[in-house]
Design a protein with these regions (language model features):
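A short, well-structured beta->alpha microelement
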Residues: 49-68
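Glycine- and acidic-residue-enriched helix-capping/strand-helix junction motifs
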Residues: 22-46
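Short, small-residue-biased leader/transition segments that mark boundaries at the very start
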Residues: 1-6
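Short beta-strand segments enriched in small/hydrophobic residues
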Residues: 11-27
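A conserved amphipathic helix/loop scaffold
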Residues: 85-292
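Redox-cofactor binding/interface segments in oxidoreductases and associated redox assembly factors
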Residues: 78-79, 114
Length: 292
């Protein structure tokens, strides 16, 4: 089989939930992935990962409990779903071994992406148990009188660079999320944070309120992973400037292809593995193959 290792050092991304490998890829599907209003803003993350040029793993909280070193081989950890569910962990965050392993992973230089209510569980004065690395918290009524001064948006961020008008469709989004001090808000709506970036020790956290699948959101997650992994410099490798077009490299087979995912003609600039580029016009649904 052809492996899609498109980089010399492909990034490893792990989805963290209560099932891990047991429900790999199926963790946000119900009954043949029928549309659910409560679910599509999370399922989009898994769908985007399925076609992304990363080595994707699914790990459980038990995996971390048995061997915290399981995190050593991972570049970016993703926790996605509603609070107090098996998706995000719920009561598992009361276990200091798991909590410290995940926070320590980020603090030492790892990346973390939280979608929805990551680590959502009311405990020790916090709701989002991943608030420290992600730099955001949910107002559940207990901290109404806390001063919340951080509301400035930074839409010129690396993560939003490919988005029309530097905006994002967050699907159902989330209400009542606010940013802690030192967090960079990328997008907030009516004083509710939808997208934020945060430096935590040597690592980075990205909060996203929801991410239904679309070609634009595909690119948002791709850039968020690169940013969280301190890998922005690698953006222009096997890359299409037009988010409707994708580049897939099969380095071991000496080939790469460029795919127009739409029913309309598209123009793009394609970057190859060494960072060199060329412009390309593509017909509707066209796939072009090239030799390396």
């Amino acid at each position: 089989g052809s492996e899609m290792f498109i980089r010399d050092s492909v990034k490893t991304v792990a989805v963290l939930n209560s099932w891990g490998q047991q429900r790999a890829w199926g963790c946000h599907m119900v009954h043949h992935a029928l549309y659910q209003k409560q679910n599509y803003s999370y399922a989009g993350v898994i769908e985007a990962l399925s076609g992304a040029p990363f080595d994707v793993k699914f790990i459980s909280f038990d995996d971390i409990k048995v061997d915290p070193k399981v995190l050593d081989s991972i570049d970016v950890l993703i926790n996605v779903g509603d609070g107090d569910t098996a998706h995000t962990g719920g009561k598992v965050w009361e276990d200091p071994e798991i909590s410290s392993a995940v926070k320590g992973f980020v603090h030492r230089g790892g990346g973390l992406i939280g979608v929805g209510e990551p680590g959502g569980h009311q405990y020790q004065g916090r709701y989002l148990q991943l608030a420290a690395p992600l730099g955001v918290e949910k107002e559940t009524g207990f901290t109404l009188n806390y001063d919340k001064y951080n509301w400035d948006e930074h839409r010129d961020h690396f993560i939003l660079a490919d988005c029309p008008d530097h905006d994002v469709d967050f699907g159902e989004g989330k209400k009542n999320i606010f940013a802690l001090e030192g967090t960079e808000i990328l997008i907030q709506r009516d004083k509710e944070v939808q997208l934020a970036a945060h430096e935590y020790g040597q690592g980075r956290g990205v909060y996203i309120s929801g991410l239904p699948y679309s070609f634009v959101n595909n690119r948002v997650l791709y850039r968020a992973i690169l940013w969280a992994a301190h890998d922005e410099a690698d953006l222009h490798k096997w890359f299409s400037t037009n988010y409707n077009v994708e580049v897939h490299a099969y380095v071991k087979n000496g080939k790469y292809c460029v795919v127009n995912n739409t029913y309309e003609p598209q123009d793009t600039t394609v970057y190859t593995g060494d960072g060199s580029s060329f412009t390309l016009h593509m017909d509707a649904n066209e796939i072009k193959w090239y030799n390396l």
